[in-house]
């Protein structure tokens, strides 16, 4: 889950991307972040020299003894991370999710897993990190949602539902046949039949992760809104997950297509 990036709606936003391979990552960094720029490096290029600490919230620090790490617990350990010399905390998925794929199956882009805390807890973490000269970025899963997301539940309810075109549907499995199956150990096709919708839906990853339709302007704009929401909260940037697969075209691998790069630019 994987590559390339979007420059968010923030001043002096910048993008860095790794080679277009299945395990590559990408960061969209908001250049106007309040954290200082160590060593006098240009603000927009801070990430090229930063020490990143990749962090799974549930495995880090538990503030209420329920056996699950949470944002208050993480915030209480910021002095330790500062002492380690961390420049930027990279948060693995924490949005609301049924957790069938470690949080990469999001059911609410604007929410936080209840066991981790609240949106206000995330805001407090970011503010306290900035006060210590550290930045915070988060994983942003753009290619697909959980099949439990209200968008998909609406989409499958009726061909006439406004959300129907937020996902990729077909009456046949014979579309985009040149696109490889990524999880060949669990998936036999990139298409899965939905009984309620009476149609196949497209997914490049697990069958419970339907792909969003980036040919739909409403989807493109809503995902920008999601990015803006977290930037407004104080996030300094994102690792954009699985972005090589945003667009599908017949006769291609449907990976790293020109339309994808144009959207992310």
Language-model segments: residues:
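Acidic/aromatic-lined carbohydrate-recognition and catalytic surfaces
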Residues: 2-224, 228, 232, 243-265
């Amino acid at each position: 889950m994987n590559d390339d990036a979007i420059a968010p709606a923030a001043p002096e936003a910048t993008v860095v991307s790794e080679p277009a391979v299945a395990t590559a990552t990408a960061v969209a960094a908001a250049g106007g972040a309040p954290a200082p720029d160590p060593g006098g490096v240009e603000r927009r290029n801070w990430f090229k020299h930063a020490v990143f600490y990749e962090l799974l919230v549930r495995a880090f620090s538990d503030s209420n003894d329920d056996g699950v790490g949470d944002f208050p617990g993480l915030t209480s350990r910021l002095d330790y991370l500062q002492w380690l010399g961390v420049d930027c905390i990279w948060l693995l998925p924490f949005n609301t999710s049924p957790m069938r794929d470690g949080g990469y199956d999001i059911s609410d882009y604007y929410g936080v897993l209840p066991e981790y805390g609240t949106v206000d807890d995330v805001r407090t973490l970011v503010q306290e990190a900035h006060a210590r000269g550290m930045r915070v970025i988060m994983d942003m899963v753009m290619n697909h949602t959980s099949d439990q997301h209200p968008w998909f539940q609406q989409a499958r309810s009726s061909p006439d539902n406004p959300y129907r075109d937020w996902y990729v549907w077909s009456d046949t499995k014979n579309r985009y046949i040149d696109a490889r199956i990524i999880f060949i150990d669990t998936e036999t096709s990139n298409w899965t039949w939905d009984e309620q919708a009476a149609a196949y839906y497209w997914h490049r990853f697990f069958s419970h992760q339907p792909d969003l339709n980036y040919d739909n302007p409403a989807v493109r704009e809503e995902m920008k809104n999601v990015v803006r929401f977290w930037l407004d909260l104080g996030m300094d940037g994102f690792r954009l997950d699985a972005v090589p697969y945003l667009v599908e075209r017949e006769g291609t691998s449907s990976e790293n297509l020109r339309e994808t790069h144009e959207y992310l630019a």
